[in-house]
UniProtKB/Swiss-Prot annotation:
The keyword Repeat does not apply. It is a peripheral membrane protein. Could be involved in insertion of integral membrane proteins into the membrane. Its main location: membrane. PANTHER family: MEMBRANE PROTEIN INSERTION EFFICIENCY FACTOR-RELATED. Transmembrane segments: none annotated. GO terms for cellular component: plasma membrane. It is found in: Cell inner membrane. InterPro entries: Membr_insert_effic_factor_YidD. This is Putative membrane protein insertion efficiency factor. It comes from the Bacteria. Keywords: Cell inner membrane, Cell membrane, Membrane. Belongs to the UPF0161 family.
Length: 69
């Protein structure tokens, strides 16, 4: 299940993200964070961490360096 989710994020990175303007306020980007979280913590916890990260990626959050715990 985790590998399938990583493939979906990679698809987004390769085919969808290049046509959108850059908007991630964090380093690593939210999609790269999602891949790292899925690989490190598995499908359930990794998805939860990625979901929380995407919610933090907004104009009211300062952003910056935010590695996977």
């Amino acid at each position: 299940m985790g590998r399938l989710l990583v493939l979906l994020v990679r698809f987004y990175q390769l085919f969808i993200s290049p046509v959108l303007p850059p908007s991630c306020r964090h380093s690593p980007t939210c999609s790269q964070y999602a891949i790292e979280a899925l690989q490190k913590h598995g499908a359930i916890k990794g998805s939860w961490l990625a979901f929380r990260r995407v919610l933090r990626c907004n104009p009211w959050h300062p952003g910056g360096y935010d590695p996977v715990p």
